[in-house]
Amino acid sequence: MANLFRRFLLSLSLTALLPLAGYAGALADLGASGAPPAAPEVSAPDRAAASGHYLKLEELDLRAVPAAPAAGSREDKEDFRVLYDWQARRTAAQCSAAKAEMSHDYETFFGKMQLFGGPTPPAAKEFFKNVAGDSVAAHKYLKGVYKRERPFARDAGIKPCLPRVAGLSYPSGHSAMARLFALILADLLPARRAELMAKADESALFRVLGGVHHPTDTAAGKALADALYKELKSKPAFRSDLKAVRALLN
């Protein structure tokens, strides 16, 4: 049964899961919605509160993460079109797979793949926990900036097949963390890059088909991950720790 479930997860591709061209359209609309905003100004206490392990908020260039779509805008309406489409066509198996990823950490997203040849070594777990701290700090800060409610809180017709999680919606923390981990792993295991990025895309899509995130939330999470990884690679402490994790793969 475990092998059957794993094959199910790996067999899901982003293309196969997309409802018509809607989700792709939502991503295209997000990228075409105008010049991204400058990183918001924050006070010193706010910056300290949003600091992670390797990164500090004031060091981040957040312009790659577009502002949340305005309520009632073309992008916002497309979000709900896609959400309703998924609500009508999602399967029990897809909802079950999405529920298995309610947590957001390395083991949830990539642990089953046993990329280290067995159980994840404690040092690797600690490394990804530290990276997760940077991801969480950044997405929580941006959620506080944009204050976009969850889709089911905005439209009573949205019926999630996942628990109605608390908190704000934009950007998706699950999407940001899954992609950030995938980018790191793809650098460590370049031959498996396509598989790793597809798994991150799948994890993001689970949040949409489950009814707890708008498509543009997940697209923004991915953009945030790209920005975070760019900054992480500039940090000597991160590079040193990444080198140590790379040695665990040999």
Where are these regions (language model features)?
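Bacterial N-terminal signal peptides
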Residues: 9-21
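Interfacial helix-loop-helix junctions of multi-pass membrane proteins
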Residues: 202-233, 240
